[in-house]
């Protein structure tokens, strides 16, 4: 996985509500600016990962309305690759920490961390954080955003 973000929004505890800070990913297990396996640092002794049982954090992408690549992902086993692009200011990366035991299509077995999500968004709790970009749309205004996920073989 590669996430094109220099910062993330730390959370206060296991509730995963952001503290209101924006923190650099540099030198932390949160740093996905260079492609790495999701599991490489997921068990690191890092408070933010302890709070959420792994990755479940918002990454700071830039100003809303600016289209940018938010993430790339690649599976070596299948050769399937993903390029995700958005004009949102944040992306929530969730590493499937609490999937539990599930049976899927064709009897496939799914368990904790057998999948991940990249969810374009405003920062969580932004309505209560004056320094975060505002997600409020006023009556009569129109809101539009665009996120695309392109899958291909690499």
Task: Indicate residue ranges for each PLM-predicted region.
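An exposed, glycine/acidic-rich loop-and-rim segment of catalytic or binding clefts
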Residues: 1-154
């Amino acid at each position: 996985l590669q996430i094109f973000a220099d910062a993330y929004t730390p959370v206060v505890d296991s509730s995963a509500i952001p503290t209101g800070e924006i923190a650099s990913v540099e030198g932390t297990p949160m740093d996905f600016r260079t492609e790495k396996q999701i599991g490489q640092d997921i068990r690191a002794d890092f408070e933010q990962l302890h709070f959420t049982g792994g990755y479940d954090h918002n990454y700071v992408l830039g100003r809303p309305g600016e289209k940018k690549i938010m993430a790339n992902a690649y599976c070596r086993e299948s050769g399937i690759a993903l390029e995700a692009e958005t004009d949102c200011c944040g992306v929530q990366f969730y590493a499937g920490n609490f999937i539990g035991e599930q049976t899927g299509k064709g009897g496939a077995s799914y368990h904790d961390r057998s999948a991940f999500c990249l969810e374009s968004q405003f920062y969580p709790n932004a309505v209560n954080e004056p320094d975060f970009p505002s997600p409020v749309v006023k009556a009569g205004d129109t809101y539009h955003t665009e996120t695309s996920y392109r899958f291909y073989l690499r």
